[in-house]
Each structure stands twice: as C-alpha cells, then as structure tokens.
Amino acid sequence: MSVQSHSFINDHFLLLSPVAERLYHTYAAHQPIIDFHSHLSPADIATNKRFDNISQVWLAGDHYKWRAMRTYGIPEKYITGDASDQEKFMAWAKTVPHTLRNPLFHWTHLELKNSFGIDQLLNPDSGNQVYDHCNRLLAGEEHTSRKFLEKYNVVYQATTDDPTDDLRFHQMAKNDPSCKIQLVPSFRLDKAFAIHDAASFLVYMDSLSAVSGIQIKDMDSLLTALQKRVDYFHSNGCSIADHGLQQLPLANTFTSKLDAEFKNFLSARGAQSFSDPDAFVFHVLISLAKMYHQRGWVQQFHLGAIRNNNSRLLKTLGADVGVDSIGDFSHASRLSSFLNTLDAEDTLAKTIIY
C-alpha cells in the first residue's frame, strides 16, 4: 500500500524532543524484548501457527477490542457471534476512528505499519483494502506467529498458565531447534483462591489432585499439591507467578479451626459456604509466596479489578470477554501488611504490582 507523505506512524512517533529521539534510536530501539506477562497462546507459538486472515490475528480473543466495539454499539454478532471474519473486521474498522485518545488507536496503527507496512488510517473507507492487503501477507512465510515475535526481537516470551496445565507446548518449543524464542510458562493460580464459588472450586481441587498425584483433603495436602506444581513449572523454565485478586487478603493467623473447616468443606462438597474466605486465601497465598522466594521467582499481583461484571456474557461466552471494570477497593493497608509479613521472615520475593 502506498506510503503517505505525512504518516501518522513515523520513525519519531511519540518522540517529542531531540533527546528522546537520540535515547530511543541509539539505545532502546535495538534492545531485545523480554515479555514476562502476556496472554499469548503457547500452542500458537510452539506450532508456529499461520493465520487465514487478519481477524484471526487481531480480533479472535482480544477482549480489549471487544469492549471498545460494545461501547460503540456494535451488535454482539459482529464481535463474538456468527458473522464472518471479514464482517467482524469491518465492524472493528468502523469502531477504530472513535477510539482516538485511547491506546487502541495507537496500537492499531503501530501494528498495521510495523507488521504489514500499512500507513493508512483504518476506518470504514479503508477497511476492505487493509483486510485484503493483510491477508495476502499472512499467506506467506514471513507472517506466522513466530515471525511476528522475531520481527520485534522478542527473545523471552512468558505465557499465562494454570497450575494444572501440562506445559506440553512449552516443551515442544524448547525441543524445536527452529524456535528462536525462549517460551516459558508463568504460574497463574486464581482458581485455587476462588473458594467463594464452591462448585467451581471443588472441580478445580479435583483437577489439581489428579495432576499432582496428591489427594487434597486438608490444608497440608493442598499446599503439598501446589508445591509439586511449583516444582513442575520450575523444571519447565518458569520463574514467574501471577495472581489476579480484587484485594490482597487481610492478615490473620492460621488455626486448627481453619484447617477443620476446610476439611469439612471438601468432604461435604461445598454443602455450606466457607465462613472466612479471606483467611483461607491469606494462608495459601503466604505459603505460596514463600515457595516463590525459595525458588528465586518473581511474584506478580493484578489488583483492583471487578471481573466478569456481565453475568449473561459470562454464562454464554465464559470469563475474560471484555466486561471487567475498575474496582473501588482499599489496598494500601492490606498490601503493606502482606508484604511485611513476608519481609519479617526474609521470605519476600521480588514483586511486581499492577
């Protein structure tokens, strides 16, 4: 596609002074990317997936775009429904001009320019031309999943993985001499804390028991099972844990009463709700944090979001479909207490807080 004389994306995009230009072009531009948090598919990277069209790359699973499209009033049919891939792309093209001043606008045009050589702004008038141009390039050998990462000099790519995952795609990538990217898992165990949702939690405990070979019947056996999965992930190159919580739990002391209630909760298959989920989460999370410290891992905490606000979409589409929101929780005292509990015992791992 033709290059416009006044490109929105150019070599000095966002560089607003000669100093900024020098710092970026001389020092930063050629540095490798070490991506320690993403939601990329390890299967796509391990198999070097080729995509049939740009909608499969851009729109399938990208709930940030889905959220923007819903905000603009696009019908769900053209977001997650049965519309064709081209129809969904054109719905996105219709939305993009209205994302101005949102990072989606910048990301969209950076990706079009850097990955596909497209200088045009994406809108309903240019949408079909952009769609066809991207698809022609995607049919070639230089626009596979790995080639995208290699183009941006990604040398270390972490994915987000549940403790019950078998990590076979990370192993596949490691054993593939043609894969130039270090593909590693991260340990994301939100489901292990969701004791407030008894039915889902108990199903997850069954899965964790099966994959760890430990029958989970009390707190000790739960922590043993989690330790085995930490060890397994570590043996597969993991050095990062990740947690999504509305708030960190209140500090409390582990007691035999907590263990007894957890035993009863498991044996009764959640017939009664757990009386103090915060106490349970605190004890499990503190125990895990000590495991991370022992292994030299980094722990990440995503705090403050209200997840899955729309129960209708949660039921029909599942979790993480673009209906989260910012919460109004209090964090400072809980965060201070949690970190201090670990630091007092010299077991505080390196920590990243979002």
What are these regions (language model features)?
Residues 2-295, 347-353:
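Metal-cofactor-binding active-site regions of metalloenzymes
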Residues 271-354:
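Long, well-ordered mid-to-C-terminal structural blocks that present hydrophobic/aromatic surfaces
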